[in-house]
Amino acid sequence: MRFLIDECLTVQLVAVAGHAGYEAYHVAHVGKAGWKDWHVMQHAREQDFVLVTNNDVDFRQLYAAQPLHAGLVILIPNVDGEKQQRLFAGALQQLAHHGEPVNQVLEVDLDGENATFYFYDLSLPG
């Protein structure tokens, strides 16, 4: 799996993915900072990236209209970089067991200090 980290999240998530054996890039480091959400999604789809974001409303809506996508990881809470890293590391463990999230979303949330993980399908009906 390859990951594209949205600019709303810390660049340190690239290192978290790398440490777990995955390829990852941050939007700001690939010349895409400031791009509109639909353009980020298009780039992720064209390059077969799983997009990692905490912009759940916009990207969930954009991805739901796509017939095929590599997947979406949403870190729901708006937390500091250290907690983002912890949540993303947990998401990577979940994905290692689950497999590639083609046409799926993995939502990661916090219940107190405990992370919760929820997979669901998200693609154009058809």
Residue ranges of model-derived segments:
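Short, basic, glycine/proline-bearing loop/turn elements
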Residues: 20-29
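Acidic, metal-associated active-site segment
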Residues: 35-49
